[in-house]
């Protein structure tokens, strides 16, 4: 009989493996796992991975909230005067929106997010762009810029002050 062969006794759940060379039982893999579970502290960090429930993101228990969301997504919000208005939607989003053009792919988080602006914000942006297209816009922007203003102490020779400061630093470093 070979003395180095291992014999497993199927007597209990925590089975031990006997080695022919020694009389001491060796712990099986199952008992080793149980031992490591006992040694681990109860508040040990555990990993758990779950995927988000994307189906229920746009569902509300409140029917009014659900109706408001559907109106918002359709661009039919009502203000205090109860007149429907449409939201401004970024043209890039319109181009990538799959509901309007079925042959286009749906935009994803890897692409640009939609920019939905209120009508008042759109009017302000258009007013700014109209004001900047005036023929004197370059002159207006230069007169209002901080570069063309006088120095902090009221003198207009800020360029000379910077040149003098740079030359003083270089002169001191040569010494």
From Swiss-Prot:
The keyword Nucleus applies. GO terms for cellular component: cytosol; nucleus. Residues 16-27 have a biased composition (Basic and acidic residues). Residues 130-149 have a biased composition (Low complexity). Keywords: Cytoplasm, Nucleus. Residues 1-14, 154-175 have a biased composition (Polar residues). The keyword Nucleus applies. Residues 1-31, 127-175 are annotated as: Disordered. It is found in: Cytoplasm; Nucleus. This is Uncharacterized protein C186.04c.
């Amino acid at each position: 009989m070979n003395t180095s062969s291992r014999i497993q006794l199927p007597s209990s759940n925590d089975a031990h493996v006997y080695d022919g060379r020694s009389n001491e039982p060796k712990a099986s893999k199952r008992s080793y796992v149980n031992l490591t579970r006992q040694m681990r502290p109860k508040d040990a960090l555990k990993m758990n991975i779950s995927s988000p429930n994307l189906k229920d993101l746009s569902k509300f228990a409140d029917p009014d909230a659900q109706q408001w969301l559907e109106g918002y997504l359709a661009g039919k919000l009502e203000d205090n005067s109860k007149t429907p208005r449409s939201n401004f939607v970024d043209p890039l989003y319109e181009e990538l929106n799959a509901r309007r053009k079925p042959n286009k792919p749906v935009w994803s988080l890897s692409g640009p997010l939609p920019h939905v602006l209120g009508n008042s914000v759109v009017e302000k942006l258009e007013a700014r762009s109209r004001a900047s297209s005036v023929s004197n816009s370059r002159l207006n922007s230069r007169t209002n810029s901080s570069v063309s203003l006088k120095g902090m102490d009221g003198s207009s020779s800020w360029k000379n002050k910077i040149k003098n400061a740079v030359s003083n630093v270089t002169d001191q470093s040569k010494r």
